[in-house]
């Protein structure tokens, strides 16, 4: 075995050769540079930001959002798009389902005029477009809606009854192999929305599985299971859904946390409702019977009235959000000037 000084010299020569061939920073000691904090994109719900552990969705990573139909998957993704744009970012939406509603997206705060939208014909085209946009280095977030709608070209060109075993899984596997490095280098967040299917003949455990094979499960840094748990009513009229999100996988913080928030029809995630829930949990808002009180000031009787008070008094909502985030040590702060990202060390 070579002596320690010789080994160190050999290693330095090898590292110099690698940097000469592949560029500076292609190999380094982890302690050589200060670790950058994980940059995030807020989700629009403070409860979900807290459950994610770092204050939002991590930049430069693959995110999977899945759940039953009409559970709020696309709404969560569009709120992330709106927050990325509010911080000055560029967003793209690959609409493989051909179901994006621009008017609804606008109500959630998405700048539809600057949003890049593609409605591809095939799965290959969708993923190639996403890959090219990511490699441009100019994108902050891209949403692929949905994995189930990424139909391989061979399946489209074939007959209706033809069997195409594993084509979509191979397509996803190849695309994610190509994308992962580019996402990290460009700091782009890729959100894949996915659907649920039932496995046949499962006797024990959950029969539910997601489409597109196993590659996305491995490459995703965060996987979120979105479920509608209750219908919100104003008298007899349904006005929204109570939604529960479980973080089933998290590479940047401890997983298996849950968040609950309200999604209101035509308005999306209720930021004010989420602030009331978290404010009560953290002791900033006092709940006495049906009345909600903040620092001696009555917000209203019943959650709906308290929500409307915060909606009309944005400075109070911002103050409550700031206190919650400071206490829990997470994420970005929303001010009158928009979303101010606050990267979090982990």
UniProtKB/Swiss-Prot annotation:
Q: Name one GO cellular component term.
A: cytosol
Judging by the UniProt lineage, the source's domain of life is Bacteria
Q: Which InterPro entries match?
A: AAA+_ATPase (IPR003593), DNA_recomb/repair_RecA (IPR013765), DNA_recomb/repair_RecA_CS (IPR020584), P-loop_NTPase (IPR027417), RecA-like_C (IPR049261), RecA-like_N (IPR049428), RecA_ATP-bd (IPR020588), RecA_C_sf (IPR023400)
Residues holding ATP: 67-74
Q: Which PANTHER family match?
A: MITOCHONDRIAL DNA REPAIR PROTEIN RECA HOMOLOG-RELATED (PTHR45900:SF1), RECA (PTHR45900)
Please spell out the taxonomic lineage of the organism that makes this protein. Bacteria, Bacillati, Actinomycetota, Actinomycetes, Mycobacteriales
Q: What Pfam families does its record include?
A: RecA, RecA_C
Please report which protein family the annotation says this sequence is part of: Belongs to the RecA family.
List locations, semicolon-separated. Cytoplasm
**Keywords noted in UniProt:** ATP-binding, Cytoplasm, DNA damage, DNA recombination, DNA repair, DNA-binding, Nucleotide-binding, SOS response
What is the primary gene name for this protein?
Answer: recA
Decide whether keyword Cytoplasm is in the record. Answer: yes
Picking any one GO molecular function of the record gives:
ATP-dependent DNA damage sensor activity
HAMAP family from the entry?
RecA
The free-text function statement in the UniProt record for this protein reads: Can catalyze the hydrolysis of ATP in the presence of single-stranded DNA, the ATP-dependent uptake of single-stranded DNA by duplex DNA, and the ATP-dependent hybridization of homologous single-stranded DNAs. It interacts with LexA causing its activation and leading to its autocatalytic cleavage.
Q: What is one GO biological process annotated to this record?
A: SOS response
Under Gene3D superfamilies, the record lists:
P-loop containing nucleotide triphosphate hydrolases (3.40.50.300)
Give the protein name, as stated in the record.
Answer: Protein RecA
């Amino acid at each position: 075995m070579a002596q320690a000084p010789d080994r160190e010299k050999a290693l330095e020569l090898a590292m110099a050769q690698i940097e000469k061939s592949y560029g500076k920073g292609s190999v380094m000691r982890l302690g050589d540079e200060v670790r950058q904090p994980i940059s995030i994109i807020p989700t629009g719900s403070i409860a979900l930001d807290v459950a994610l552990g770092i204050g939002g969705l991590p930049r430069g990573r693959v995110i999977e959002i899945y759940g039953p139909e009409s559970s709020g998957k696309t709404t969560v993704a569009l709120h992330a798009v709106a927050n990325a744009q509010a911080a000055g970012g560029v967003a793209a939406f690959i609409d493989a389902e051909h179901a994006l509603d621009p008017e609804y997206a606008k109500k959630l705060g998405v700048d539809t005029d600057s949003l890049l939208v593609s409605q591809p014909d095939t799965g290959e085209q969708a993923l190639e477009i996403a890959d090219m946009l990511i490699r441009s280095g100019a994108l902050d977030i891209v949403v692929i809606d949905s994995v189930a709608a990424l139909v391989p070209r061979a399946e489209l060109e074939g007959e209706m009854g033809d069997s195409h075993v594993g084509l979509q899984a191979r397509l996803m596997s190849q695309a994610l192999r190509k994308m992962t490095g580019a996402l990290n280098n460009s700091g782009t967040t890729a959100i894949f929305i996915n659907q649920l299917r039932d496995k046949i003949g499962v006797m024990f455990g959950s029969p539910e599985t997601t489409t597109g094979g196993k590659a996305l499960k491995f490459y995703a840094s965060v996987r979120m299971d979105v479920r509608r748990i209750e219908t919100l009513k104003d008298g007899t009229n349904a006005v929204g859904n109570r939604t529960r999100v479980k973080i089933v996988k998290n590479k940047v913080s401890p997983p298996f946390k849950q968040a609950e928030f309200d999604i209101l029809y035509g308005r999306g995630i209720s930021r004010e409702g989420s602030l009331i829930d978290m404010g009560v949990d953290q002791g900033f808002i006092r709940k006495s019977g049906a009345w909600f009180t903040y620092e001696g000031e009555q917000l209203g009787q019943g959650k709906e009235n308290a929500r409307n008070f915060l909606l009309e008094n944005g400075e109070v909502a911002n103050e409550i959000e700031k206190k919650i985030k400071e206490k829990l040590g997470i994420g970005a702060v929303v001010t009158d000037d928009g979303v101010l990202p606050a990267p979090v060390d982990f």
